[in-house]
A protein has these predicted regions:
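C-terminal motif of bacterial Sec signal peptides marking the signal peptidase cleavage site
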Residues: 18-21
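PDZ/PDZ-like peptide-tail recognition elements
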Residues: 53-110, 178-180, 186, 190-191, ...
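Short pre-active-site segment immediately N-terminal to the catalytic Zn-binding motif
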Residues: 120, 207-224, 280
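Conserved PDZ fold ligand-binding element
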Residues: 121-146
């Protein structure tokens, strides 16, 4: 039997004929003007940027209280602090450059993005939107590294404990500002624009995702997660994870060498396996410690800690596996009980007037026992 074949033009024509017979809307709808559509698109994009900026400022205001009140828990990881942050249009994707500059005045020169209430910058009169022209006679560069260079300069000058002389452009005028630095835990707090419920610490930074900011219902919840990640950094968990990974890798390397001596080429498989296993050692304990120390950071900043366990319970409902998974995080029931115990411990210390410091295995250092890595939540 001869196979039936269809030419492409004939098939396309048949498809169009079938589609033409499909049901259509029954009302006469308004036509959409292309110019109006472009304007609406721009408005919505402006709203996206504004929402990000508001989340950023909220995050920085909460974080400022925590890093300035928790200096005793940061041991040797403290630095000068002014209570200001900066951004330039390079901190936004290229597709947003036009909007952030034309609508919000953020150019390729660093400008002040937030000023923490009560901070040195706030008391000196620094305002969000100020464009930084000079720092003790030094002119900040423009472009990709504008913000990093500015923040590095502020830290460098602050280490001398001398007044910081700023010249900023505010509107059409130049304003001179003088201020002295305070002290804070020396970790930068950043907001990732990604729309996921996540946060992590990397030993130098605390990164909160925009999706997590949208998930927070109260500033106490913001403080809880920031404090948890700060605890990872303060307890040097990232360094500990790296050390454990190195030890595991060395053990694996010895196995690779032994296998090679027996005529087996493992291609370094044991070293990689050992490194991964080493990095995972104490991961659950490190998370528990970050919960524990983090609540002390939070309480020292004056935030209410009563609902801490309830927040992690709500987080668990978005990831049901977390209720039983214990590979790198404590299970939710276990976490809830441990957090409630810590909350009661802190309540008792507050009631008796004791210092709000974690109970350490070794009382030698301010807060430095075992140490771990940034683990997303």
């Amino acid at each position: 039997m001869q196979a039936i074949t269809f030419s492409r033009p004939a098939t396309f024509a048949l498809l169009l004929a079938v589609l033409a017979g499909c049901a259509t809307p029954q009302t006469r709808m308004p036509t959409v003007d292309s110019a109006a559509m472009q304007e609406e698109t721009r408005k919505q994009r402006e709203m996206v940027v504004e929402d990000y900026m508001n989340s950023y400022r909220r995050l920085q205001a909460v974080a400022s209280r925590i890093v300035t009140s928790g200096t005793e828990l940061c041991a040797d990881k403290m630095g000068p602090y002014y209570g200001l942050t900066a951004w330039s249009r390079e901190d936004f994707g290229k597709e947003w450059h036009d909007i952030v500059q034309s609508r919000f005045g953020v150019s390729d020169v660093a400008s002040i993005s937030s000023v923490a209430p009560g901070s040195a910058a706030d008391q000196a009169g620094v305002k969000a939107g100020d464009v930084v022209l000079s720092v003790n006679g030094w002119t900040p560069p423009a472009g990709k590294d504008a913000v990093d260079k500015l923040m590095e300069k502020l830290v460098q000058e602050g280490k001398f404990g001398m007044p910081l002389e700023l010249i900023v452009r505010r509107g059409a005028e130049e304003v001179r500002i003088s201020m002295m630095p305070g002290q804070a835990c020396d970790f930068r707090v950043r907001l990732s624009p990604d729309d996921v419920k996540n946060a992590y610490a990397d030993g130098q930074n605390i990164v909160i995702y925009k999706g997590m900011m949208d998930f927070f219902r109260t500033d106490e919840e913001v403080a809880l997660v920031v404090s948890h990640e700060l605890a990872h950094n303060a307890m040097k968990h990232i360094d500990a994870k790296k050390t454990n990974a190195m030890v595991g890798g060395l053990v694996g390397l010895l196995l690779d060498v032994a296998a090679a001596a027996g005529g087996v080429n493992t291609n370094g498989d044991f070293m990689r396996l050992g490194s991964n296993m080493g990095a995972g050692v104490y991961s659950v304990a490190f998370e528990q410690e970050a919960d524990y120390v983090g609540l002390y950071f939070m309480a020292n900043a004056g935030y209410k800690i009563d609902d801490a366990a309830s927040f992690w319970r709500r987080m668990a409902t978005t990831n049901s596996r977390a209720i039983t998974m214990k590979s790198s995080h404590p299970t939710t029931p276990e976490r809830f009980i441990a957090i409630e115990t810590t909350v009661e411990e802190i309540r008792q210390k507050l009631g008796s007037g004791q210092p709000l410091k974690p109970e350490l295995k070794n009382a030698g250092s301010a807060v430095a026992r075992e140490e771990v890595q940034a683990i997303p939540h």
